[in-house]
């Protein structure tokens, strides 16, 4: 996909929205903003952006697990329903995309 001139700013806007929603306790909204950032980073093959999404998803889940364990997608709540947390799945998705991207050093 060709680079859109505003793709980088869209990525940053998604991260800003994620942080604002997370700070306000709107965890599901924060998740979706972070997922949107993941899709933008993937489209741009932005390894730094993908790594940032992976890190943020993991960090935010850790905070949720401590401060809001009753939230439906905390580790405890998600596992009680037999599923992993959506934040964990987002971190794993970012990791999987990173593994599939071409090596930046030009390896084939």
Residue ranges: model-predicted function:
Residues 1-20, 27-108:
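C-terminal-biased regions
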């Amino acid at each position: 996909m060709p680079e859109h001139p505003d793709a980088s700013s869209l990525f940053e806007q998604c991260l800003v929205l994620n942080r604002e929603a997370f700070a306000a306790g709107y965890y599901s909204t924060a998740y979706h903003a972070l997922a949107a950032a993941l899709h933008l980073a993937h489209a741009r093959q932005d390894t730094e952006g993908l790594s940032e999404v992976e890190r943020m998803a993991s960090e935010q889940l850790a905070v949720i697990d401590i401060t809001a364990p009753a939230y439906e997608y905390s580790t405890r709540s998600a596992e009680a329903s037999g599923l992993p947390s959506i934040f964990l799945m987002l971190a794993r998705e970012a990791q999987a995309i990173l593994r599939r991207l071409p090596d930046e050093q030009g390896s084939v």
